[in-house]
């Protein structure tokens, strides 16, 4: 696992964890905007981006690696943790592993209720069409369609280049493992109730029902959690495509005194 850093490392630390299939650049724009006040750390999960040759194991293993980094490089504590989809689930696990690891946490569109049937369908889809879906030609087409159909959410050229570099080298076994762990089997740990972090849990209005149910379950088990429904949006839109809207929502949360 690699880590990209932005800002002065004497400032409060914020760790932002990308979703499955993407890489550190998922939060690149937010990191740059936050870096004048914070030291922002963007991990590259095993099996993703420049770490594509490393085997992705599980949410728990990823959380352990990030926890070790925080112990070694941040004196065991960060100001905030954040993550989208798989990254948000890793945040949940980190909060469960260490009740006082962070003052704040931002989770976006993450599951904590197992969905084995959905995982089986997703794995079947990847096995049948994965190589076609993530070919360079297909990725170029996806970016063109995004510009045409959703210009507000289109990537800038820099992120397009990262996308075209990283997505075609994503191995199908990595996606299958993610579906088997993130989607099919991960359950919220009882220890989450001991976490002292203040949590903002974001989900899109158009998310699947299981994501909304996960948000409600998390709030039931973690009593210092505020839910936010992003009206009109689908899975992970604020974190992945709309960094300015993400900043408008998250900045007051980060700056608010408890």
Located regions from the model:
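Flexible "cap/lid" loop of the alpha/beta hydrolase fold
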Residues: 96, 104-133
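Conserved HGGG/HGGXW glycine-rich cap/lid loop of the alpha/beta-hydrolase fold
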Residues: 5-52
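Gly/Ala-rich beta-loop-alpha elbow adjacent to hydrolase catalytic centers
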Residues: 83-87, 91
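Conserved alpha/beta-hydrolase "acid-adjacent" motif
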Residues: 208-214
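Catalytic histidine-centered segment of alpha/beta-hydrolase-like enzymes
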Residues: 233-245
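Active-site loop/oxyanion-hole signature of alpha/beta-hydrolase fold enzymes
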Residues: 41-82
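Conserved alpha/beta-hydrolase catalytic His-Asp/Glu region
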Residues: 116-118, 136-191
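Short beta-strand/loop motif that positions the catalytic acidic residue
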Residues: 195, 201-203
